[in-house]
Amino acid sequence: LGTVFSTSSTADAAADALDQRVSGARRAETGRTAAWVYYFSSQDPLSAYGGGGLAASVLKDAGLTSVYAESRDAYLSVSVESLLERRPHWIVLGYGLYGESAEEARARFLAEPGVEALEAVSAGRIVLLPAGASSSSPTAVAGLEQLVSATAE
């Protein structure tokens, strides 16, 4: 777009700054797992990001392994039972896809029957990230930085 609008130098500088932020935030593999879950709408069941798509890359750059990495699909319908089987060390909970706040997303997730049996939940290892953190935008870079900071042990 920088070429189209004759702002290449500004666009290139902004892209370089984002690249530097990603490089600065990127962390080596931690050996920890995570499930990045979300609700697509107020009526839809729990969903998760699979191994395809930007969310999987953000988890990997944060040094985490997605418990749904084997699925090449980017978007999955999941159940609490599936989470219990996969035992993620961290829960990354996306919010805001349909206008819900972080607090509303957390309350909805914690109200799911059986979720209290997840070790990540009982240990308080839930990271809330805005919906934009899983899409190609500068918000994804901020989401990576927030995720790395929140999952530092």
Describe the predicted segments one by one:
Residues 28-30, 84-86, 119-122:
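Extracellular/periplasmic catalytic domains that process cell-envelope and extracellular macromolecules
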Residues 39-45, 73-75, 96-100, 132-135:
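Solvent-exposed loop/turn segments at secondary-structure junctions
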